[in-house]
Curated annotation (Swiss-Prot):
Enzyme class label: hydrolase
Reactions this protein catalyses: N(7)-methyl-GTP + H2O = N(7)-methyl-GMP + diphosphate + H(+)
Keywords attached to this entry: Cytoplasm, Hydrolase, Nucleotide metabolism
InterPro entries attached to this UniProt entry: ITPase-like_fam, Maf-like
UniProt record, GO biological process: nucleotide metabolic process
Residues forming the catalytic site: D75
Highest taxon, organism lineage: Bacteria
Cofactor(s) the record lists: a divalent metal cation
GO molecular function: nucleoside triphosphate diphosphatase activity
Annotated localization: Cytoplasm
The name this protein goes by in its record: 7-methyl-GTP pyrophosphatase
Length: 198
């Protein structure tokens, strides 16, 4: 690995345990920080645009705390046609989302940013991932939610856990995008910042 002095320290701007676990797979040292950003869609905003805007806002929020760092942020918005499916935040909303999605195709728009707060260079991408949900009974939905309680996950499902059982098929360029941190794109961005992984 290159000498650490050649690039700023890495900061993962996320409180997600799963994003942290994904980033650990790259075997590079990093710290975490939780950005304070209000997560909501603007009227008429496309799902990918919402995810990208929020990921950028998170990067700039973390940059205020770390003015000399490579800051990694991400956000994810699920969409069923024109309907945006954010974090349900309650059992009732999660039941409603899963009923709506059963047997249907949902697109997860995973936005990724790498912001160099030393140089103000921002790299950003949205990586879509298509998910076909199984036909689920109301009973299956209730049992799943009782076991996993995915109330802070876009689309009410944790694909990194039992939520994988809700899914019939996943299509996309990076399977990690569904969990919330597209590693393939992140590696490309880190290489642009001259971070050597091996």
């Amino acid at each position: 690995m290159k000498n650490r002095t050649n690039y700023p320290p890495l900061i993962l701007g996320s409180s997600s345990v799963y994003r942290c676990e994904l980033l650990q797979r790259l075997q590079i040292p990093f710290e975490t920080a939780s950005p304070a950003v209000d997560e909501f869609a603007l009227p008429g905003e496309a799902p990918g645009t919402t995810a990208l805007r929020l990921a950028k806002e998170k990067a700039h929020a973390v940059a205020k705390l770390f003015p000399d760092a490579l800051i990694i942020t991400a956000d994810q918005v699920a969409a069923l046609g024109e309907i945006q499916l954010g974090k349900p935040l309650s059992h009732e909303n999660a039941v409603q989302q899963l009923r709506l999605m059963r047997g249907r195709e949902v697109i997860f728009h995973s936005a990724l940013c790498l912001f160099n707060s030393r140089t103000t260079r921002l790299q950003a991408r949205v990586i879509p991932c298509s998910v076909k949900y199984r036909e689920l009974s109301d009973s299956q939905i209730e049992h799943y939610l009782a076991k996993e309680q995915p109330y802070h996950c876009a689309g009410s499902a944790k694909a990194e856990g039992l939520g994988i059982a809700l899914i019939e098929r996943i299509t996309g360029e990076d399977p990690n995008a569904l969990i919330g941190l597209p590693l393939i794109a992140l590696v490309e961005m880190l290489m642009e910042e001259e971070v050597e992984l091996f």
